[in-house]
C-alpha cells in the first residue's frame, strides 16, 4: 500500500475508475450479445433492432476511450455483414 498521500489518492481513484470501466464494458458486451443472439435465432428484424440499440453505445465507449475506435468499427462491420446475410 502507498505511503504518500497523493499515491493513496491515485489508488482510490484508480479503483473507482476500474469499477466504472468494468460496468460500462459489461453493459456494452451485453448489448453485443443481444445482437448475436438475434442473429443465431435467424430473426433479421430483431437483429436489426438490437444492432440499432448497440451501435451508439459502442460508439460512445470508443469515444470515451474504453475501447479502441477500430474495435468498435470491427464489431459494427462484422455484425452488419452477418445481419445482411440473414434471409
Swiss-Prot record:
Q: Which UniProt keywords apply?
A: Ribonucleoprotein, Ribosomal protein, RNA-binding, rRNA-binding
Gene Ontology BP, a term: translation
Output the Gene Ontology cellular-component terms.
cytosol; small ribosomal subunit
Respond yes or no to whether keyword Zinc-finger is given for this record.
no
Task: Output the Gene Ontology terms for molecular function.
Answer: small ribosomal subunit rRNA binding; structural constituent of ribosome
Which family does the UniProt entry place this protein in? Answer: Belongs to the bacterial ribosomal protein bS20 family.
Q: What does this protein do?
A: Binds directly to 16S ribosomal RNA.
Q: Which NCBIfam families match?
A: S20
Name of protein: Small ribosomal subunit protein bS20
Species lineage: Bacteria, Pseudomonadati, Pseudomonadota, Gammaproteobacteria, Enterobacterales
Amino acid at each position: 500500500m502507498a505511503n504518500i498521500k497523493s499515491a493513496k489518492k491515485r489508488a482510490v481513484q484508480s479503483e473507482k475508475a476500474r469499477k466504472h470501466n468494468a460496468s460500462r464494458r459489461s453493459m456494452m458486451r451485453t448489448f453485443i450479445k443481444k445482437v448475436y443472439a438475434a442473429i443465431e435465432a435467424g430473426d433479421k428484424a430483431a437483429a436489426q433492432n438490437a444492432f440499432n440499440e448497440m451501435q451508439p453505445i459502442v460508439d460512445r465507449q470508443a469515444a470515451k476511450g474504453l475501447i479502441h475506435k477500430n474495435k468498435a468499427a470491427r464489431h459494427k462491420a462484422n455484425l452488419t455483414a452477418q445481419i445482411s446475410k440473414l434471409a
